[in-house]
Curated annotation (Swiss-Prot):
Keyword Lyase: no
Any further remark recorded for this protein: All late proteins expressed from the major late promoter are produced by alternative splicing and alternative polyadenylation of the same gene giving rise to non-overlapping ORFs. A leader sequence is present in the N-terminus of all these mRNAs and is recognized by the viral shutoff protein to provide expression although conventional translation via ribosome scanning from the cap has been shut off in the host cell.
Organism of derivation: Canine adenovirus serotype 1 (strain Utrecht)
Protein's name according to its UniProt entry: Penton protein
Keyword vocabulary terms for this entry: Capsid protein, Host nucleus, Host-virus interaction, Late protein, T=25 icosahedral capsid protein, Viral attachment to host cell, Viral penetration into host cytoplasm, Virion, Virus endocytosis by host, Virus entry into host cell
Induction: Expressed in the late phase of the viral replicative cycle.
Family (UniProt): Belongs to the adenoviridae penton family.
Localization, UniProt: Virion; Host nucleus
Function, in words: Major capsid protein that self-associates to form penton base pentamers, each in the shape of a pentagon, situated at the 12 vertices of the pseudo T=25 capsid. Involved in virus secondary attachment to host cell after initial attachment by the fiber protein, and in endocytosis of virions. As the virus enters the host cell, penton proteins are shed concomitant with virion acidification in the endosome.
Length: 33
């Protein structure tokens, strides 16, 4: 539950910052939770 909550916050930040929209997904994909 906590991980999904963090991802939701991350998605909100991604919407605000387009650059993170490319970096965040790569980090999340590289780090398999």
């Amino acid at each position: 539950v906590q991980t999904s909550h963090q991802s939701n916050k991350a998605m909100e930040h991604v919407k605000q910052i387009p650059s993170l929209g490319v970096v965040v997904p790569r980090v999340l994909s590289s780090k398999t939770f």
